[in-house]
Amino acid sequence: MTTNYIFVTGGVVSSLGKGIAAASLAAILEARGLNVTIMKLDPYINVDPGTMSPIQHGEVFVTEDGAETDLDLGHYERFIRTKMSRRNNFTTGRIYSDVLRKERRGDYLGATVQVIPHITNAIKERVLEGGEGHDVVLVEIGGTVGDIESLPFLEAIRQLAVDIGREHALFMHLTLVPYLAAAGEVKTKPTQHSVKELLSIGIQPDILICRSDRAVPANERAKIALFCNVPEKAVISMKDVDSIYKIPGLLKSQGLDDYICKRFSLNCPEANLSEWEQVIYEEANPAGEVTIGMVGKYIELPDAYKSVIEALKHGGLKNRVTVNIKLIDSQDVETRGVEILKDLDAILIPGGFGYRGVEGKIATARYARENNIPYLGICLGMQVALIEFARNVAGMDNANSTEFVPDCKYPVVALITEWRDEDGNVEVRSEKSDLGGTMRLGAQQCQLSDDSLVRQLYGASTIVERHRHRYEVNNMLLKQIEAAGLRVAGRSGDDQLVEIIEVPNHPWFVACQFHPEFTSTPRDGHPLFAGFVKAANEHQKRQAK
């Protein structure tokens, strides 16, 4: 089986939407029956984004196999059926780390280790490994052509195109075509200079995707084709749209998939985009709207919650309602009070780390519980809901997490290495013990209680969801909380760890330790988000009576 590669680069400015363009093209090719995957090569020196600030980098997307990756992999999974893994994302830091380990082991037999060939060879090896078993692999290069950080990756893909043969390699370059209101026309010069920069590295683009706030006229596309040495039919206009899910249809309408299949000599049927047409129809024709408050600590950069925001929109699609998301800083709840939570149809508290804003989240969970407002807590959102219930219902004054108050009287949430048994002895666990280390990452099984709301929502007794956390519900203090009325609706496959809690005498109060947003897609949605948005819609109707 021969694997074909499409290398995706960006020019002029960053944030042009290379990830969306690559994912949209992959969706079209998948709709033609091809086995497609996407890779992201990030030029930063961090080994992975796991320890990077969400405010600076955006969310960390967790794959099934537990890799902490770039948020673009979330876009990839929302557009195609193929699941991403740690083989789909690697960074400069990871490449250099691997090469340096080999050098220390003597794998290079005393050779002088250099960017070329050692770093570029390592990059090529990982691209080829990630592409095994697929018809087409799209490889997105992070950053912008001209950045010094990207040079080893660009050199590697230049070499790789020669290695595998140009008949199996395409270079697709995204570039900005700005509109100047004063001149009343779009300008192609930035694109010409961007392609010139790419040519200086030794890469001739085969396809140009022209990003603009409007459709790029045919005469301007012809001009770009002439000056950039690209066929006119390979100069594609990608204008701004009100929904990213319109991009596959936009690219297909200009024959991009036909051009690629012809270049790769792929004989495959026409793409059937009916599923995407249905998504677009549902998005454009809602029967109502709801307002959901998301109370977090990284709200100045919405991309920090990208998958949650998208999952809420997917929940809206499944209920034919538009979801308006109100981002609320949890510190504002602390300083201004819960009054700022009024007029919401539902409340969601997403994941997070650190003490800042936690008391505001706890107050938010209490407000939702006491006022019968639909509540969905994710990761930390479950932990604060548990702390709130322990304090205000179970009589455990000052209950907390050891993440925030290490010596609290009631550590209802703690590292699994900090649990104490019924005799008060610290339970010692390590990365070699059955429960693993202190960080749970990736897909794990969860058993649902038969009498739970989530059992009805999922329609199954066993589910698999992705995790990213260090702290767990402290089982040694759980009995007192359950006796006060909290329901444990889901436990880990070994029945050891609390995965889902519910408040039974509440219209809709669900909190989970895992991250359901990572498996929500526009075509399929997710049971928790669909149920949550439905509850928000019902709450709105009750309030209107």
Swiss-Prot record:
Mg(2+) binds at residues 72, 140. ATP binds at residues 15-20, 72, 239-241. Residues 291-542 form the Glutamine amidotransferase type-1 domain. One of its GO terms (cellular component) is cytosol. L-glutamine binds at residues 352, 380-383, 403, 470. It catalyses: UTP + L-glutamine + ATP + H2O = CTP + L-glutamate + ADP + phosphate + 2 H(+); L-glutamine + H2O = L-glutamate + NH4(+); UTP + NH4(+) + ATP = CTP + ADP + phosphate + 2 H(+). The active site is at 379 (nucleophile), 515, 517. Its EC number is 6.3.4.2. This is CTP synthase. One of its GO terms (molecular function) is ATP binding. One of its GO terms (biological process) is CTP biosynthetic process. CTP binds at residues 14, 147-149, 187-192, 223. It is an enzyme of class 6 (ligase). Residues 2-266 are annotated as: Amidoligase domain. It comes from Salmonella typhimurium (strain LT2 / SGSC1412 / ATCC 700720). InterPro entries: Class_I_gatase-like (IPR029062), CTP_synthase (IPR004468), CTP_synthase_N (IPR017456), GATASE (IPR017926), GATase1_CTP_Synthase (IPR033828), P-loop_NTPase (IPR027417). Transmembrane segments: none annotated. CDD domains: CTPS_N, GATase1_CTP_Synthase. Homotetramer. UTP binds at residues 14, 187-192, 223. It comes from the Bacteria. Catalyzes the ATP-dependent amination of UTP to CTP with either L-glutamine or ammonia as the source of nitrogen. Regulates intracellular CTP levels through interactions with the four ribonucleotide triphosphates. CTPSs have evolved a hybrid strategy for distinguishing between UTP and CTP. The overlapping regions of the product feedback inhibitory and substrate sites recognize a common feature in both compounds, the triphosphate moiety. To differentiate isosteric substrate and product pyrimidine rings, an additional pocket far from the expected kinase/ligase catalytic site, specifically recognizes the cytosine and ribose portions of the product inhibitor. Belongs to the CTP synthase family. Allosterically activated by GTP, when glutamine is the substrate; GTP has no effect on the reaction when ammonia is the substrate. The allosteric effector GTP functions by stabilizing the protein conformation that binds the tetrahedral intermediate(s) formed during glutamine hydrolysis. Inhibited by the product CTP, via allosteric rather than competitive inhibition. Pathway: Pyrimidine metabolism; CTP biosynthesis via de novo pathway; CTP from UDP: step 2/2. Keywords: ATP-binding, Glutamine amidotransferase, Ligase, Magnesium, Metal-binding, Nucleotide-binding, Pyrimidine biosynthesis.
